């Protein structure tokens, strides 16, 4: 992930912007600082600047005042950037905008939405929101309170505010960029003026986001001038996990240590326990974080795709300014597995397909079709010959897959573990495989290189209080982060109670990490384990049913301050568990439905109800 930094130069003297300040340091301190600075490279300076800022915030130190005479010219205003992010993409875009604003001499500040008070918008002149969308159109957890405030009657009128919104989402889903659309509408309703039109960016958002930021900055240069970039600092707290310089854009080349199937021979699922060696990388992570994995497309799929549109793969194409063969571009740079509605609609027009054109006019049918097909299936709907440029114009750029980390570093050291469900099904008699999951499970041999990075997730974290009880709901591969939670709690010697609810199809074939859970039960680290195997009896039973079965105990734990976690499928499981939790609160707390919903909402705001759903 990118870190917000205050840019400093290297060399034998202090950076000019720093030297220009009325220094609060004595001569000895200045000399010591200068000697240290000259020994650091640009990357180290960037880290140190963020670290010292975090210290200054935690110790409530003030930033030195800069008078008009100490800067080139006084600022006519400042830019406030607010990010609403679930997995880190929106945060990364917001940090990039901050750096670019600083470089342009614009005074700017960056806020995590959870740290920003909505009423303070009345004091702002220029605000940019960068917002991702969680689940089925929900605001990310860090933006729930701000989202609720801005749509309430408590929100202030904002006639003096100019704003812009960049939404991130996936057009495959019905509520594409819904959180960005919400913030845009809220601000308009409050009388704010759009600085720039909202951008609804898809999965491959990088190029569109870069152009949008350029547009924003070209406007802001005329309206916000003169502030020294060194005064622009992020106000969100420095993470407890030191951020490495490896990121989505600059991943670390690790190696695959283990890929072990952990479902039974007769299971209908192929779930893998993956271990990746991070030795000498310096990468650190916390329970709740995710690992980003860059993958390569299967040669067989690339060849089939080329054959379907009459291309050889030897054609030369330009990718990011580099000349590549089409085969190489499809292998390393383009998404050729999952279909999406935009692909279907564009191919329908290009191929003049009546069938696909008719389908594209029905949004619900289009989404359903795109969900169950892959790119190759769409291209085979019509026999057409495409040019290399036409083919690439249909495709999204390849993006890494994020997997919930299934290990604690206090337990495994310089390794990271994943629990990966291999996507595998048949379509019209042919096998279809997921891109990243099949890469990890089938393409890579042990010892092979794999490019990875850590995506920190501050919205899914263990409580700082080791005495707090935990209730963890993780069916299927949703069990992954709770393996890391339990490992961490054991290594910390945490006294808090731990309760795990796991579900899958059958006890004998699909009980993931069964031996480990039994060990933790025996040792007392895990206080309770409830399981729901849906196909082991005539009537299907799921984790939400187990919650309702134990409603009295769930309520008791909540009253004792328990934290409630859910990981796994967003489309059905997470919704059903959410409704079951409300029912538990309603029945056991003696509340009506509306009051129970408010209680659960307050749990989320207090970060005692956290979800990692997908």
From Swiss-Prot:
Residue ranges of domain FAD-binding FR-type in the record? 249-463
State the pathway, as annotated in the record: Sulfur metabolism; hydrogen sulfide biosynthesis; hydrogen sulfide from sulfite (NADPH route): step 1/1
Protein residues bound to FMN: 85-90, 132-135, 168-177
Span of domain Flavodoxin-like:
79-217
- Keyword Ribonucleoprotein present in the record's keywords: the answer is no
Q: Cellular component per GO? A: cytosol
Q: Which residues bind NADP(+)?
A: 534-535, 540-544, 576
Q: Which reaction does it catalyse?
A: hydrogen sulfide + 3 NADP(+) + 3 H2O = sulfite + 3 NADPH + 4 H(+)
Co-factor requirement: FAD; FMN
Task: Write out the residues that bind FAD.
Answer: 337, 371, 401-404, 419-421, 425, 434-437, 614
EC number(s) stated in the UniProt entry for this protein:
1.8.1.2
Q: Does the keyword Flavoprotein apply?
A: yes
What the entry lists under InterPro entries is as follows: CysJ (IPR010199), CysJ-like_FAD-binding (IPR003097), CysJ_Proteobact (IPR029758), FAD-bd_FR_type (IPR017927), Flavdoxin-like (IPR001094), Flavodoxin/NO_synth (IPR008254), Flavoprot_Pyr_Nucl_cyt_Rdtase (IPR001709), Flavoprotein-like_sf (IPR029039)
Record note on cofactor? Binds 1 FAD per subunit. Binds 1 FMN per subunit.
What superkingdom does the record give? Bacteria
Q: GO molecular function terms here?
A: flavin adenine dinucleotide binding; FMN binding; sulfite reductase (NADPH) activity
* Matching CDD domains: SiR (cd06199)
**Assembly:** Alpha(8)-beta(8). The alpha component is a flavoprotein, the beta component is a hemoprotein.
Q: What does this protein do?
A: Component of the sulfite reductase complex that catalyzes the 6-electron reduction of sulfite to sulfide. This is one of several activities required for the biosynthesis of L-cysteine from sulfate. The flavoprotein component catalyzes the electron flow from NADPH -> FAD -> FMN to the hemoprotein component.
The name this protein goes by in its record: Sulfite reductase [NADPH] flavoprotein alpha-component
Q: Which organism is it from?
A: Vibrio cholerae serotype O1 (strain ATCC 39541 / Classical Ogawa 395 / O395)
């Amino acid at each position: 992930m990118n870190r917000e930094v205050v840019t400093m130069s290297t060399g034998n003297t202090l950076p000019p912007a720093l030297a220009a300040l009325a220094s609060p340091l004595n001569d000895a301190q200045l000399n010591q600082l200068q000697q240290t600075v000259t020994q650091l490279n640009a990357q180290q300076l960037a880290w140190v600047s963020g670290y010292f800022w975090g210290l200054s915030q935690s110790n409530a130190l003030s930033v030195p005042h800069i008078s008009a005479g100490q800067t080139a010219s006084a600022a006519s205003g400042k830019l406030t950037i607010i990010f609403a992010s679930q997995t880190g993409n929106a945060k990364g875009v917001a940090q990039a905008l901050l750096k670019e604003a600083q470089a342009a001499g614009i005074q700017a500040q960056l806020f995590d939405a959870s740290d920003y008070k909505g009423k303070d918008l009345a004091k702002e002149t220029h605000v940019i929101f960068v917002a991702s969308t969680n689940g089925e159109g929900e605001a990310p957890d860090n933006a729930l309170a701000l989202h609720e405030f801005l749509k309430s009657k408590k929100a202030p009128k904002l006639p003096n505010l100019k704003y812009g919104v960049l939404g991130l989402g996936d057009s495959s889903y019905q509520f594409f960029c819904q959180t960005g659309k919400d913030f845009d509408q809220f601000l308009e309703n409050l009388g704010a003026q759009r600085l720039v039109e909202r951008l609804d960016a898809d999965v491959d958002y990088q190029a569109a986001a870069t152009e949008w930021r350029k547009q924003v900055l070209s406007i802001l240069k005329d309206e916000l001038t003169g502030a020294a970039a060194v005064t622009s600092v992020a106000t969100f707290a420095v993470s407890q996990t030191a951020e490495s310089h490896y990121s989505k854009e600059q991943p670390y080349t690790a190696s695959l240590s283990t890929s072990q199937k952990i479902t039974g021979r007769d299971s209908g699922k192929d779930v893998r326990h993956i271990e990746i060696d991070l030795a000498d990388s310096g990468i650190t992570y916390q329970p709740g974080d995710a690992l980003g994995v860059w993958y390569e497309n299967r040669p067989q799929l690339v060849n089939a795709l080329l054959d379907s549109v009459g291309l050889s793969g030897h054609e030369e194409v330009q990718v990011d300014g580099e000349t590549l063969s089409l085969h190489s571009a499809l292998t390393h740079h383009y998404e050729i597995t999952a279909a999406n509605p935009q692909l279907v609609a564009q191919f329908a027009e290009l191929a003049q397909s009546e069938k696909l054109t008719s389908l594209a006019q029905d949004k619900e049918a289009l989404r359903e079709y795109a969900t169950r097909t892959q790119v190759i299936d769409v291209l085979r709907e019509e026999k057409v010959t495409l040019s290399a440029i036409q083919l690439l114009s249909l495709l999204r750029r390849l993006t890494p897959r994020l997997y919930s980390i299934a290990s604690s570093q206090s337990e495994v050291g310089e390794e990271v573990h994943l629990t990966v469900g291999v996507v595998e099904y048949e379509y019209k008699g042919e096998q279809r495989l997921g891109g990243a999951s099949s890469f990890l499970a089938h393409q890579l041999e042990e010892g092979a290189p794999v490019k990875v990075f850590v995506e920190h997730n501050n919205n899914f974290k263990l409580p700082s209080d080791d005495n707090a009880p935990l209730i963890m709901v993780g069916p299927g591969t949703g069990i992954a982060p709770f393996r890391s939670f339990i490992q961490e709690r054991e290594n910390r010697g945490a006294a808090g109670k731990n309760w795990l609810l796991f579900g899958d199809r059958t006890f004998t074939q699909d009980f993931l990490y069964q031996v480990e859970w039994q060990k933790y039960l025996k040792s007392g680290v895990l206080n309770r384990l409830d399981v729901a195997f849906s196909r082991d009896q005539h009537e299907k039973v799921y984790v939400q049913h187990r919650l309702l079965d134990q409603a009295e105990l769930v309520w008791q734990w909540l009253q004792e301050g328990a934290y409630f976690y859910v990981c796994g499928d967003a489309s059905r499981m997470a919704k059903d568990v959410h409704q079951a939790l409300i029912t538990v609160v309603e029945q056991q707390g003696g509340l009506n439905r509306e009051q129970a919903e408010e209680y659960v909402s307050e749990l989320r705001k207090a970060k005692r109800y956290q979800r990692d759903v997908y």
